[in-house]
């Protein structure tokens, strides 16, 4: 019923605009476009002042996401998914499906869990009592994850509110990032207005390492998903024991060199890949992922379903250690989806390839 009403409303709006615009001289169209774009922008800003609950349905898996008011990034992502036709980051979901089926006893950790999309999805997919770990630096997002889990009737997500790094230090958690504002200011990597927001609204806390977080746990993850907006260098180099001894799969968004310079100073993309290879992983670039403009939502439902059903296969490019810099050289316009797999596991054992 919802889709029928939406289609009918779309037709009414289209024909109404057609009737209104037809008599107007074409030279005025550019001004009309500017006005409409501003109208859409203001509408989005107003909508962000409200909390929304977004129903997610990925094949036979259903869950809910709690999107708090004024969470601009969550509103940007999830308002695109309200009609239920598309899913977020389909390539990662498809790859994750194959891994969860392939691993004998999967234990999942969502590093940079945001509002709980992957944590809720994996919990529903596995449907057992082992914990799903959701690691998040932002206090408010941690509360959002708990609300998403509660709305989805999920009880096995363990939310870990922590700032991760490669060593013990004091950093600020602000929005989706963790940073040292003094270092950013010294290197002039962000503007002064942004720094003022960080200092005013950010939370200053001591960091820990992922090795230390899971040293205290009886059940250790063997699958990691990581989206930490440029902090992946510092976090991974503080996770060497976990990666070496326990993790079989790492699904990671490798961010741009600019993001790494801000949030993982001293680490390059090549450092990260070579570090993983030294820890007995094979690293692969997976496509499709982004269209180059950070658009991480499938262009159409048919394409999305073909990957979910494995009738279309993901493509991979293995990164050889001595060619790492060359392979990554011209891939800096958007985030890259990296799948790192322990060397004894053949990537072709995953049915998404």
Residue ranges: model-predicted function:
Residues 258-269, 294-302:
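Short, flexible/disordered intra-domain loops and linkers
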Residues 146-147, 151-180:
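Core alpha/beta nucleotide-donor-binding catalytic domains of modification enzymes
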Residues 160-162, 281-290:
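Conserved S-adenosyl-L-methionine
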Residues 2-154, 196-200, 217, 285-353:
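S-adenosyl-L-methionine
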Residues 122-127, 239-247, 276:
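Short, conserved loop/helix-junction motifs that constitute active-site signature segments
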Residues 78-109, 158, 167-172, 181, ...:
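Short internal loop-to-helix segment that lines adenine-nucleotide cofactor pockets
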Residues 247-255:
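Conserved beta-strand signature within the Rossmann-like core of class I S-adenosyl-L-methionine
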């Amino acid at each position: 019923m919802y889709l029928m009403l939406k289609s009918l409303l779309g037709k009414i709006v289209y024909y109404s605009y057609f009737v209104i615009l037809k008599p107007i001289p074409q030279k005025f169209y550019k001004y009309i476009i500017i006005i409409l774009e501003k109208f859409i922008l203001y509408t989005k800003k107003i909508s962000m002042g409200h909390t929304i609950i977004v129903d997610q349905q990925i094949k036979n898996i259903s869950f809910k996401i709690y999107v708090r008011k004024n969470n601009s990034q969550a509103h940007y992502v999830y308002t695109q998914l309200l009609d239920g036709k598309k899913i977020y980051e389909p390539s990662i979901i498809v790859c994750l499906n194959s891994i969860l089926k392939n691993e004998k006893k999967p234990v999942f950790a969502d590093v940079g869990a945001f509002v709980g999309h992957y944590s809720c999805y994996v919990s529903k997919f596995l449907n057992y009592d082992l914990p799903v770990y959701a690691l998040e630096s932002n206090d408010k997002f941690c509360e959002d994850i708990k609300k998403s889990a509660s709305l989805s009737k999920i009880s096995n997500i363990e939310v870990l509110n922590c700032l991760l790094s490669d060593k013990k230090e004091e950093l600020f958690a602000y929005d989706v990032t963790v940073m040292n504002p003094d270092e950013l200011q010294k290197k002039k990597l962000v503007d002064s207005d942004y720094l003022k927001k960080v200092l005013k609204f950010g939370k200053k806390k001591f960091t820990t390492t992922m090795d230390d977080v899971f040293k205290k746990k009886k059940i250790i993850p063997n699958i990691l998903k990581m989206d930490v907006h440029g902090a992946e260098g510092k976090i991974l180099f503080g996770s060497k024991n976990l990666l070496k001894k326990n993790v079989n799969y790492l699904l990671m968004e490798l961010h741009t060199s600019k993001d790494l310079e801000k949030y993982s100073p001293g680490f390059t993309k090549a450092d990260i890949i070579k570090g993983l290879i030294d820890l007995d992983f094979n690293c692969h670039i997976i496509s499709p992922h982004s269209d180059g403009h950070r658009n991480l939502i499938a262009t159409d439902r048919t394409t999305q379903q073909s990957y979910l059903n494995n009738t279309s296969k993901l493509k991979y490019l293995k990164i050889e250690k001595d060619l790492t810099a060359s392979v990554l050289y011209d891939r800096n316009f958007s985030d890259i989806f990296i799948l790192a797999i322990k060397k004894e596991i053949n990537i072709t054992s995953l049915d998404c390839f």
